[in-house]
Amino acid sequence: MSPTLQLACDLISRASVTPEDAGCQALMTERLRAIGFHIESLRFDDVDNFWAVRGASGPILCFAGHTDVVPEGDPAKWQSPPYEPTITDGLLYGRGAADMKGSLAAMVTACEAFVAEHPNHTGRIAFLITSDEEGIAANGTVKVVEWLEARGEKVTWCLVGEPSSTQSVGDVIKNGRRGSLGCKLTVKGKQGHVAYPHLAKNPIHLVAPALADLAAEQWDEGNDFFPATSFQVSNFNAGTGATNVIPGEAAIVFNFRFSTESTADELKQRTEAILAKHGLDYDIHWHLSGEPFLTPAGALVDAAVTAIRAECGAEPELSTSGGTSDGRFIAPTGAQVLELGPVNATIHQINECVNVADLDKLSATYQRILKELLA
């Protein structure tokens, strides 16, 4: 069993359901301390984080990731217990195998191999690890970034170990992500009897034309790196459960996934202008989960592409598709950010798994990126 596979198994065996760490970070920091990293453990509320650095000065290449996992669901539906790492037909099964304990193991073993070859490397290597990525993400990476900024430390390049690949490891690199802007809209009407609509105001009827306009709106056209901004309603709640009562209010939850062609403020203003056009009486609450970011061609992209060609035999696609990641907290500091990890086909699913051979490929790829930037 390779060092990367062994460490991945050790991490999977710890049931670190968000925001629990369950001892995963202790495993990692023990290994990193042994090769000269200075470790700073950072606990914010119920969340464990750590920042580890090797090297005294110069640009920082940071490995970022999370030890927490999503709940396993019904264990009886798994082909093997979700926290007992099991290898079957070349696949490693277990919760977190792909998202993202396999990546964490590859990061650590890549650094061990790199430091053994280059004990006096240039620049600095860092780890920013949290147990609060799969949950509300309020006391994890975002807090560590604030802590780093307060003491004037800036990450130059950042590799986030999210499972970016689709068919084979290294076939896709995420070099950006769309922004995410959520909203809860409560439209007020007047409750009444369905037989006497003239004595009531039906908020469903009132808001329906506005929602149709919002859904039909062309928010932007996207660009070479991002698709057009999308608007999606995820929840619509109204009514008392009775069939003869017009509801007094309707609550709608919707989300924008937006490109760099739009800003959160612009989307808010345009949304509220459409609502105003329809004369609605409403309350509105916005939540910005993250701004869009893009890492263009440069040192980090070049290093990653070179490494993937050499270690995976793939020609990677640069993509900004998919959901958000903790890269959204790191990119605004000015860092170049990429997401590079294993195949994402089974993440958050029953029988989550990762190809065993891909773990060593990923470790070798991370090691090659270290060589390209810091050797």
UniProtKB/Swiss-Prot annotation:
Pfam families recorded: M20_dimer, Peptidase_M20
Cofactor binding summary note: Binds 2 Zn(2+) or Co(2+) ions per subunit.
Protein name per UniProt: Succinyl-diaminopimelate desuccinylase
Keyword tags: Amino-acid biosynthesis, Cobalt, Diaminopimelate biosynthesis, Hydrolase, Lysine biosynthesis, Metal-binding, Zinc
Leader sequence residues: none
Catalytic activity as recorded in UniProt: N-succinyl-(2S,6S)-2,6-diaminopimelate + H2O = (2S,6S)-2,6-diaminopimelate + succinate
Keyword Hydrolase: yes
Subunit structure: Homodimer.
Pathway: Amino-acid biosynthesis; L-lysine biosynthesis via DAP pathway; LL-2,6-diaminopimelate from (S)-tetrahydrodipicolinate (succinylase route): step 3/3
Enzyme class: hydrolase
Gene Ontology MF terms in the entry: acetylornithine deacetylase activity; cobalt ion binding; succinyl-diaminopimelate desuccinylase activity; zinc ion binding
Catalytic residues of the enzyme: D68, E133 (proton acceptor)
